[in-house]
Regions:
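Conserved active-site alpha-helix within GNAT-family acetyltransferase domains
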Residues: 91-108
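Conserved acetyl-CoA pyrophosphate-binding loop and the N-cap/start of the following alpha-helix
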Residues: 63-71
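A conserved short alpha-helix in the GNAT/GCN5 acetyltransferase fold that borders
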Residues: 71-76, 100
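Conserved catalytic-core motifs of GNAT/GCN5-like acyltransferases
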Residues: 87, 105-119
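A short, internal acetyl-CoA/4′-phosphopantetheine-binding micro-motif in the GNAT/acyltransferase core
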Residues: 56-64, 89
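C-terminal "cap" of GNAT-fold acetyltransferases
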Residues: 113-146
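Conserved GNAT acetyl-CoA-binding A-motif
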Residues: 77-88
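Acetyl-CoA-dependent GNAT
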Residues: 6-51, 61
């Protein structure tokens, strides 16, 4: 079972339809997890403004500790973001549960902002991110240089 971390347009185009979004390589970054040659998870980062960055996450398999380290290291360490923002439809219970399990909190709720109803704005700050420490970082053998 071979795992690897990759980045680029292929990952972005894999994530976009799974999060009902789009990927624009010139304005975004994407980091993916590959298992036996197939992308099983991916993250798109966009709208970096010098303080915060928006993320969209798609998962079709299990995540590795090293991948979790990389996908949080990129915005917080490489970009220097103070906050990650993850917009999720309130009707998408799988994604809301995933965000909560990862440590995101609901910072805002925008009524009727998605076709299904409300839009939840999940956020995370570096000081609340459990994935940046040695527990996950030591398991990362090839940090993404995305």
């Amino acid at each position: 079972m071979a795992w690897s971390i990759t980045h680029g347009a292929e990952v972005g185009h894999w994530v976009a339809p799974r999060v009902a979004g789009q990927y624009h390589a010139e304005m975004s970054q994407a980091i993916g997890l590959v298992r036996e040659g197939k992308i099983v998870a991916g993250v798109i980062y966009e709208n970096w403004n010098g303080a915060s960055i928006v993320t969209h996450i798609a998962i079709e398999g299990r995540l590795t500790p090293g991948y979790l380290y990389v996908i949080y290291r990129f915005p917080f360490v490489q970009c220097g973001a103070r906050k990650i923002i993850a917009p999720v439809s309130a009707t998408n219970t799988k994604s809301t549960t995933m965000c909560e399990d990862m440590g995101f909190i609901i910072e805002a709720r925008i009524a009727d902002a998605t076709p299904g109803g409300d839009l939840l704005m999940f956020t995370m700050t570096a000081d609340k991110c459990k994935y940046l420490g040695d527990r996950y970082g030591k398991k990362c053998q090839s940090p993404a240089s995305a």
